[in-house]
Amino acid sequence: MKSQAALSKKSLQLGKRHLELMDELESMLDQGKSFSTMSDLAKQLKISLRTLYEIAPSKEELIVTTVDRVLKKHGKIAMDAMNAQSSPIRKLESFLAVANQAVGPRLERFTQPLNNLNSSKQMVDYHEQYITTVIKNLLDEARINKEIRDIDTQATALLLGGLGRYFLSKKHLKDLKQTPEETSNFLTEIIIDGIKLENS
């Protein structure tokens, strides 16, 4: 959590040019391009190495910072989709539909480089914890509104919030018949349908 706080503080200190460079790096990763060193990236972006080090102290931290920014943008899209709905259960369904895209083809290109980075775990854990908290709050509201059965909302939130990351792991990925996103959506629908009350 300390690492995530440092990332947030760092993002507040970045200037307009730094943010533009991060957009360029995001575009590079989106296109599947890579860079071996900070110096290599500086050449590709046609900037000074010093400017790059103002954003992050290492290649590893730069990738983590960029992916953190991408996930926050995606989180905002999920929250906007949720807020467009009226009832807690509809909000939950909309939120999860977008949240599961985090393990879809596009965002997987960003998260895949994190697999071998030790410093990425805290950042990924932070985002998963945030998603789980949103899910639990919506489940609690849905239970109060009698839209779902009287369930253990914490356990259900942990399950729904961790599906994508679970199926994205190399250990399980090779055995899936569908993509992690499709599998997560399939199981999410089964779980939600199983806890809904008839009047919802």
State where each predicted segment sits.
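C-terminal peripheral helix-coil segments that are non-catalytic and often amphipathic
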Residues: 1-8, 94, 133-144, 162, ...
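Helix-turn-helix
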Residues: 2, 20, 24, 28-61, ...
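Generic hydrophobic, amphipathic alpha-helix propensity
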Residues: 13-25, 41, 66-70, 74, ...
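Amphipathic, non-transmembrane alpha-helical scaffold segments
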Residues: 14, 63, 67, 71, ...
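Hydrophobic alpha-helical connector segments
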Residues: 65, 78-105, 157-160
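Secondary-structure edge/capping motif, primarily at the C-terminal ends of alpha-helices
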Residues: 81, 107-114, 167, 171-174
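Helical hydrophobic small-molecule/effector-binding pocket
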Residues: 89-113, 125-129, 197-200
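Amphipathic alpha-helical packing segments from all-alpha helical-bundle domains
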Residues: 119-145, 154-158, 166-169
